[in-house]
Amino acid sequence: MIMEINKYKILAALVRSFFDAFSSGIIDNSDVAAEERRQPKNVKQSMLNHYEHVAPVFFDTIFFPLAAMNFQYDDIMRIVREAQGRGDDMHGLVKTACASDAMYEAMVAEYKRNFSALLGGRCVSVASHLEDYTRPAEGADVEMLDAERAIELTVRVVMYAYARGLRHSVADGKPLLRQATLFRLLLDAMNVLLSDEAAKYDDCEDDLAAMFLKVCQSQHNFTVMTSEMDRTYDELVSKEEIDGNDTMTK
């Protein structure tokens, strides 16, 4: 069982998961017929319609997970206070949360790669991501993070990004977290976080639990994932005014 994951792999998983989830939230509430929403021209148009929202929502969503990956809680609070004192914006906060120039440059590279793909009409596939995500320079010291914490942070990014995509595409009322979309997002997120190749589900026979166990790689990791889903769900209902009646957790 994987006990630790290198931070570059986690960073790449967080960024891809944000773009997959945020774009899915927007697309789920598109006026286009459901069977046509994922066509490249419609994906591209959906992202162009919300172009100005992407960076602000990205910074707001990714700051805490990045900071939690690199700092202790007390240090995060200090970083926020110091940034406020300097008048830093969210971009500046996120740069500080990266903790090193190399990690910040990796984040920027992943941001550009994922956003460019969506503007071209597609999300970066799991296989393409695992082949091409930004690695550390050869010979560089690479810090590791406990796999449990990495899973929790990734789940948080998926659910917050999806919810915020929904909110930006709903004019009135509470947006609905769609169960099928959330399952797909989490399957892909766990795949890119915990594996080095795209999962094949031929032997799962459409059994969702078997699919999740495959990408989570253990019952323990699956439990960590679902527990974080419950915690994040409660936050979304209270803070983001999300209607979660269609989710699997409640």
Q: What role is predicted for each listed range?
A:
Residues 1-8, 13-59, 66-155, 165-250:
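Extended non-catalytic scaffold regions that mediate assembly and binding
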